[in-house]
């Protein structure tokens, strides 16, 4: 999902991703 570490690298706009 959006909050997975890999997707947080790719999709930094996700609300649960840092930065």
Curated annotation (Swiss-Prot):
Subcellular location(s) per record: Secreted
Domain notes: The cysteine framework is III (CC-C-C-CC).
Principal cellular location given in the protein's record: secreted
Protein name: Conotoxin Reg12f
Tissue spec: Expressed by the venom duct.
Family: Belongs to the conotoxin M superfamily.
GO molecular function terms attached to this record: toxin activity
Keywords tagged on the record: Disulfide bond, Hydroxylation, Secreted, Toxin
Statement: the UniProt record of this protein carries the keyword Disulfide bond: yes
GO cellular component terms attached to this protein's record: extracellular region
Organism encoding this protein: Conus regius
Superkingdom of this protein's organism: Eukaryota
Cysteines paired by S-S bonds: 2-16, 3-14, 8-17
Entry keyword Secreted: yes
4-hydroxyproline carried by residues: 5, 15, 18
